[in-house]
From Swiss-Prot:
This is ATP-dependent protease ATPase subunit HslU. It is found in: Cytoplasm. It comes from Haemophilus ducreyi (strain 35000HP / ATCC 700724). GO terms for molecular function: ATP binding; ATP hydrolysis activity; peptidase activity; proteasome-activating activity. One of its GO terms (biological process) is protein unfolding. ATP binds at I17, G59, V60, G61, K62, T63, E64, D253, E318, R390. The lineage of its organism: Bacteria, Pseudomonadati, Pseudomonadota, Gammaproteobacteria, Pasteurellales. GO terms for cellular component: HslUV protease complex. Its main location: cytoplasm. The gene is hslU. The keyword Nucleotide-binding applies.
Length: 440
């Protein structure tokens, strides 16, 4: 992917307000993946990614940056919560499962790309199978197929099939029968589950079963079957592993929750252990997955945390060293809230306008109304827990509560949400100090 850092930041700007430093850091890291691939083979092996630690309060855009980056990257990407993992020896998921899950994501990605690449051939083959059911080949008295008489009719039906005029017609088709084996295992033993499922599914013979379904559904099933025939599974595995090793990105959220708090001498079960287990994976090691061995040397790791109780210095020194780029995200201001309400491509005000439009109600947010909403959300954050932009959801839901409830009875109305309307709807926030009802 040859998208430039400026283009990456511009794309992130369309969805996330502020946090320029964090956007620049991830943009450079993403571009460096492409730069590295342009180097000679020997030098490429020596260039390792500069992992990132994003520090900032909740609700300022850390997770959203990761989510949008995943779409931009067009590469294997996985987001995990550090708190979901336990030290080796404890019940729960081990950190190796991060790489295994990333490989699964990569496998799905390359499979989709391979299917898309062969889609035209698979589409033709699937259509032929449907047409064989609709128009069984005519045979003469000796059993030979008469193609000439049938060819023109098949072309007419193929055209109808592509136009969708036969979509709702039901037909009987032969589809590959799959043995679905559900195995329940304790947490942390997911790999054994997948291996047993593969074993049982592999033991079942390749049988087909007749199923009655609409042509539009049958076409999808047959398209998948034909595409699978055109794909080399072993080749896909190699491509998936290479994609993980060279382009994989892991986003680890809530990294601060596995820190041992300063001055706390209590037994934080497996917290430091999780950090120690993360060390070799981030530094570079080999993890065994069901598709083969995966080297983690060139996987990019982006960690994030609020660090409200713990501090970045509470991380193990070795782990700090493996996260050389530290980016601090700033708390959101009232002006930021105003921009969040209006500027993103799918801003909150736009979402509410479009939702109410489905009921025939026209909503208009005035500038002073938006300013009042931002002020209310900012004030609640200051008075209680600061949950960043998530507070806007709470305030807007309260503001729109009455309209949302009886919108179906108000079709055709034009409702203007200005400063006066907001002040009335959020009266208990504006006038009272008791803000408990807004605390999530």
């Amino acid at each position: 992917m040859s998208i430039t850092p400026r283009e990456i930041v511009s794309e992130l700007d369309a969805h996330i307000i502020g946090q320029t430093e964090a956007k620049r850091a991830v943009a450079i890291a993403l571009r460096n993946r492409w730069r590295r691939m342009q180097l000679s083979e020997d030098l490429r092996q020596e260039v390792t990614p500069k992992n990132i630690l994003m520090i900032g309060p909740t609700g300022v855009g850390k997770t959203e940056i990761a989510r949008r980056l995943a779409k931009l990257a067009q590469a294997p990407f996985i987001k995990v919560e550090a708190t979901k993992f336990t030290e080796v020896g404890y019940v729960g998921k081990e950190v190796d499962s991060i790489i295994k899950d990333l490989t699964e994501v990569s496998m799905k990605l390359v499979k989709e790309q391979a299917v898309e690449k062969n889609r035209i051939r698979a589409q033709d083959a699937a259509e032929d199978r449907i047409l064989d059911v609709l128009l069984p080949p005519a045979k003469d008295q000796w059993g030979n197929v008469q193609e000439t008489d049938n060819a023109s009719t098949r072309q007419i039906f193929r055209k109808k099939l592509r136009e969708g005029s036969l979509d709702d017609k039901e037909i009987d088709i032969d589809v590959a029968s799959q043995v679905n084996v559900e195995i329940m295992t304790p947490p942390g033993m997911e790999e054994m589950t997948s291996q047993l499922q593969s074993l049982f599914e592999g033991m079942s013979p390749n049988k087909t079963q007749k199923r009655k379904m609409k042509i539009k559904d049958a076409l999808k099933v047959m398209l998948d079957e034909e595409a699978a025939k055109l794909v080399n599974q072993e080749e896909l595995k190699q491509q998936a592993i290479e994609a993980v090793e060279q382009h994989g990105i892991v986003f680890i959220d809530e990294i601060d929750k596995i820190c041992k708090k300063s001055g706390n001498s209590g037994g934080d079960v497996s917290r430091e252990g999780v950090q120690r287990d993360l060390l070799p994976i981030i530094e570079g090691s080999t993890v065994n997955t069901k598709y083969g061995m995966v080297k983690t040397d060139h996987i990019l790791f982006i960690c994030s945390g609020a660090f409200q109780i713990a501090r970045p210095s509470d991380l193990l020194p070795e782990l700090q060293g493996r996260l050389p780029i530290h980016v601090e995200l700033k708390s959101l201001t009232k002006a930021d809230f105003e921009r969040i309400l209006t500027e993103p491509n799918a801003s909150l005000t736009l979402q509410y306008r479009e939702l109410m439009k489905t009921e025939g109600v026209t909503i208009e947010f005035t500038q002073d109304g938006i300013s009042k909403i931002a002020e209310s959300a900012f004030r609640v954050n200051e008075k209680t827990e600061n949950i960043g932009a998530r507070r806007l959801h709470t305030v807007l839901e309260r503001l729109m509560d009455g309209i949302s409830f009886d919108a179906n009875e108000r079709a055709g109305e034009h409702i203007v949400i200005d400063e006066k309307y907001v002040a009335t709807a959020l009266n208990d926030v504006v006038e009272n100090e008791d803000l408990s009802r807004f605390i999530l």
